Amino acid sequence: IPLPPHPGHPGYINFSYEVLTPLKWYQSMMRHEYPSYGYEPMGGWLHHQIIPVLSQQHSPSHSLPPQHHIPIMAAQQPAPPQQPVMPVPGQHPMAPTQHHQPNLPQPGQQPYQPQPAQQPQPHQPIQPIQPIQPIQPMQPMQPMQPMQPMQPMQPQTPVHAVRPLPPQPPLPPMFPMQPMSPMLPDMEAWPATDKTKREEVD
């Protein structure tokens, strides 16, 4: 009996909570950057699940968003047009942390460059630094808009290719492996009986 196709159904069972969430995130990242490499058909049946996972990856917990987006999915089913909008907030908490850190020293270096030229006026370049510091916590919010054209940049591909690895530890404790574990003691028990027979032969 096939499962109900849409997550809004009360009998819907989503097996991809602990297994495919990192894959879905990585595929959505790659699909957003390289839409022609065949990632769209891979995520065709994941459209409903990818949107909330990306929108709620601001929170570190990956197990809670699926519980919340089950009722939300019924409303977001017609939301594939929102995908180009939703993956963006999912990418920014990852991207700005690494792209603004190299950018933050740059504004620090720019005022330092005029300092040796204007040694008698070291306080003037320091004053523009002070208003920049309170703005720095706001910078990850503001550059989100200019970061959108930066997303397709290839240097980010290793950044996102490395990020999905930490959430993957849930993959090893797959449920299909657990029913196999009792099979191994059974196979070990057979040689034990053979040993008793060997003892009898001895």
Curated annotation (Swiss-Prot):
The modification Phosphoserine is found at residue 16. Residues 77-202 are annotated as: Disordered. It is found in: Secreted, Extracellular space, Extracellular matrix. SMART domains: Amelogenin (SM00818). The keyword Secreted applies. GO terms for molecular function: structural constituent of tooth enamel. Residues 101-112, 126-158 have a biased composition (Low complexity). Pfam families: Amelogenin (PF02948). Residues 78-87, 113-125, 164-176 have a biased composition (Pro residues). Plays a role in the biomineralization of teeth. Seems to regulate the formation of crystallites during the secretory stage of tooth enamel development. Thought to play a major role in the structural organization and mineralization of developing enamel. Belongs to the amelogenin family. PANTHER family: AMELOGENIN, X ISOFORM (PTHR46794:SF2), AMELOGENIN, Y ISOFORM (PTHR46794). This is Amelogenin. It comes from Monodelphis domestica. The gene is AMEL.
